Amino acid sequence: IKITIVLIDNHGYASIGGLSKSVGSDGFGTKYRYRTESDHPDGETLPLDFGQICAGMGANVLVAHTRDAFGAALQAAREITDRPVCIITEVDRRQRVGGYESWWDVAVAEVSENPAVQQAREKYEGDKTKERHHL
């Protein structure tokens, strides 16, 4: 199958981690980390080798560390026609995009002892009253 996969490695679930932080949950469980003596996943980053995983499934793996290298990898991927291609690029999980001037209805826990979650719930309830239904 001719397919090109772009694997963006942010060492976890950065998008959902940002969402989790925005609702007071501090991104729990959204980083690929070793567990420490505290039994929490707050140790060193897990050394996941996505390239080996993809190669093990038969893909040709290209790694791009820069924008130019990414462009070159895309071009090279077009020329590989006999099997899947996976382009892997590592990104900074802390880098975010700007706001969207919209509201996403993501419910926040109603009951929590965490003040950040309580604040997020209060804001959520206020924002929910402004929700508009278009259908």
What label would you give each PLM region?
Residues 1-135:
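Thiamine diphosphate
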